[in-house]
From Swiss-Prot:
InterPro entries: Cyt_b/b6_C, Cyt_b/b6_C_sf, Cyt_b/b6_N, Cytb/b6-like_sf, Cytochrome_b, Cytochrome_b_C_euk/bac, Cytochrome_b_N_euk/bac, Di-haem_cyt_TM. Heme b b562 binds at H83, H182. The keyword Membrane applies. Heme b b566 binds at H97, H196. This is Cytochrome b. Disulfide bonds: none annotated. It comes from Sousa chinensis (Indo-pacific humpbacked dolphin). GO terms for cellular component: mitochondrial inner membrane; respiratory chain complex III. Changing L296F: In strain: Isolate South Africa. PROSITE patterns: CYTB_CTER (PS51003), CYTB_NTER (PS51002). The chain crosses the membrane at residues 33-53, 77-98, 113-133, 178-198, 226-246, 288-308, 320-340, 347-367. It is a multi-pass membrane protein. Component of the ubiquinol-cytochrome c reductase complex (complex III or cytochrome b-c1 complex) that is part of the mitochondrial respiratory chain. The b-c1 complex mediates electron transfer from ubiquinol to cytochrome c. Contributes to the generation of a proton gradient across the mitochondrial membrane that is then used for ATP synthesis.
Length: 379
């Protein structure tokens, strides 16, 4: 008699995705982040659900309801900080996952990659609308500044901004709709993640060498299930350490002041995971130009498969490309740092240079390095 997991219509899908899935025998820990992102998503949905049970999306009570969750609800402070720091862990895993894809040429699976870029944009949108919900100073002014960027769109910009706000400023209507978006988006992310996985399983996983994986495959379970559990435990350990020892490490103190439309914080800045894009936005002294650079800094990922010039898929055996890749990582860290600094002398020019270098590396230097490496190998 055949095992039920291979015959039952539902079990068969799960079996083919997580148990009998043929997986390359040599994938490293960089391949752990996919499952960790799934874990993050589940954690965020669960903690978010419990927070939504006690939260009120209304300008007069939103801030108080978050304070009520932290003070009066059993383990409310824990759920709230798990959710806030869980978002940071989510982005750490996301950026590691994307970095892995860039380094090992996983972007050559174009459908999987494009759904991945769409997922990144959706997660960023979710995090942005979620940050507005506690209705602190940074929530309010962050929402005002970022939504206002749409007014840079010629002709329809101002109308579009007022349509999103539901009025002439960020107010009650804005908060209510942002809560609605924040509730629905994670389920859209879940659906997109399923499609992401569907496309991945059409081709099978890439591996560090970049050569076809079908040479040597092993079943996903038990080899990679145990490896994923180790990764999950490390993720949970890090998240718990962050949540229980320094819950406010990554937050902004301004968000502990209730939103006040009459007083602007000294430095308006987003959460750390958006700082690199914020630095690129600020480095261009023109509203429309800045908005376009901001969009392009993320959407550039879509064009990466087209910029592949090397005949080798992975960077594993390409020292020149490796050097440029790590320069890109250093550049992104520099941009993240600059995004959190005030707009004054040394920071402005450093931000502008780092922004130029970011686009130069991806659009010019890395494709050129690929061609040089082909020549060096007499290809």
């Amino acid at each position: 008699m055949t095992n039920i997991r291979k015959t039952h219509p539902l079990m068969k899908i799960l079996n083919d995705a997580f148990i009998d899935l043929p997986t390359p025998s040599n994938i490293s820990s960089w391949w752990n982040f996919g499952s960790l992102l799934g874990l993050c998503l589940i954690m965020q949905i669960l903690t978010g659900l419990f927070l939504a049970m006690h939260y009120t999306p209304d300008t007069s009570t939103a801030f108080s309801s978050v304070a009520h969750i932290c003070r009066d609800v059993n383990y409310g402070w824990f759920i709230r900080y798990l959710h806030a720091n869980g978002a940071s862990m989510f982005f750490i895993c996301l950026y590691a996952h994307i970095g892995r894809g860039l380094y090992y040429g996983s972007y050559m699976f174009q459908e999987t990659w494009n759904i991945g870029v769409l997922l990144l944009l959706t997660v960023m949108a979710t995090a942005f609308v979620g940050y507005v919900l506690p209705w602190g100073q940074m929530s309010f002014w962050g929402a005002t500044v970022i939504t206002n960027l749409l007014s840079a769109i010629p002709y329809i910009g101002t109308t579009l901004v007022e349509w999103i706000w539901g009025g002439f400023s960020v107010d009650k209507a804005t908060l209510t709709r942002f809560f609605a978006f924040h509730f629905i988006l994670p389920f859209i992310i879940t659906a997109l993640a399923a499609v992401h996985l569907l496309f991945l399983h059409e081709t099978g996983s890439n591996n560090p060498t970049g050569i076809p994986s079908n040479m040597d495959m092993i079943p996903f379970h038990p080899y990679y299930t145990i490896k994923d559990i180790l990764g999950a435990l490390l993720l949970i350990l890090t998240l718990l350490a962050l949540t229980l020892f320094t819950p406010d490490l990554l937050g902004d103190p301004d968000n502990y002041t209730p939103a006040n439309p009459l007083s602007t914080p000294a430095h308006i800045k987003p959460e750390w995971y958006f700082l690199f894009a914020y630095a690129i936005l600020r480095s261009i002294p023109n509203k429309l130009g800045g908005v376009l650079a901001l969009l392009l800094s993320i959407l550039i990922l879509i064009f990466i498969p087209m910029l592949q010039t090397s005949k080798q898929r992975s960077m594993m055996f390409r020292p020149l490309s490796q050097l440029l890749f790590w320069t890109l990582i250093a550049d992104l860290l520099t941009l993240t740092w600059i995004g959190g600094q005030p707009v004054e002398h040394p920071y402005i020019i450093v931000g502008q240079l780092a922004s130029i270098l970011y686009f130069l590396l991806i659009l010019v230097l890395m494709p050129t390095a690929g061609l040089i490496e082909n020549k060096l190998l007499k290809w």
